[in-house]
Amino acid sequence: MLRRSKNSSTNTNADTKKRQSMHLGSKSSLISLTSEFGHGHSKTKQKKEEGTAPSQFLSPTNKRSTSSQSKLKRSSLLLDETLLKDYHSAMRHMQTNAAKEEKLRMAPSPTQSTRSESDASLSSTKSSISSIFSQDNDYSIHDLLYEDIEEMDKTDAFKINNTIAIDDSKALFVFCSNDSSSRTASIETLHESNLDNLDMGSSRRTSLDFF
């Protein structure tokens, strides 16, 4: 019966170790080594999946909430003193602008009239229209009636000697020249006389226009 010696077993182990060495140059050995490496990597991955906690296999909503919480947590860590100062400065700026916009909104617009209908009346003291009926106006009706007469008295071309009121006439005044025969006529005579017989060349009628 043949027996293996101790030296032969040692040589066999050495040969086995040589065959499993990384310094193999043959193409077949390289392919086998690659397959063994892939097989070992798959085993490692399988063990890792088996050791994974069941909390990781949650629903998509839970995953989204968890991821959002983690993002918020990470972003909160980025807030430093400079960012906080900028934030408070921006908030104060927004509040100031909001207060200014509120004041502008409450203030009356220049193009928008805030007066009542009574203030828009010509006789009102708040009226923006110049009127002879206004209390602040120093121009009276008497001045308006005699304005033309005073202007004509200042000139040499035409003089006003008398203003006579005539009944049944649309004219307010009859202006007579110096050479007119109606200069000395009394009011009673004019009332009784026929207006058609008056010398219209020496007198003229005028009317009063209100603006």
From Swiss-Prot:
The modification Phosphothreonine is found at T184. Present with 1200 molecules/cell in log phase SD medium. Residues 63-73 have a biased composition (Low complexity). GO terms for cellular component: cellular bud neck; cytoplasm. The keyword Phosphoprotein applies. Residues 26-35, 53-62 have a biased composition (Polar residues). The modification Phosphoserine is found at S182, S186. It comes from the Eukaryota. This is Uncharacterized protein YBR071W. The keyword Transferase does not apply. Keywords: Phosphoprotein. Residues 1-73, 96-123 are annotated as: Disordered. It comes from Saccharomyces cerevisiae (strain ATCC 204508 / S288c).
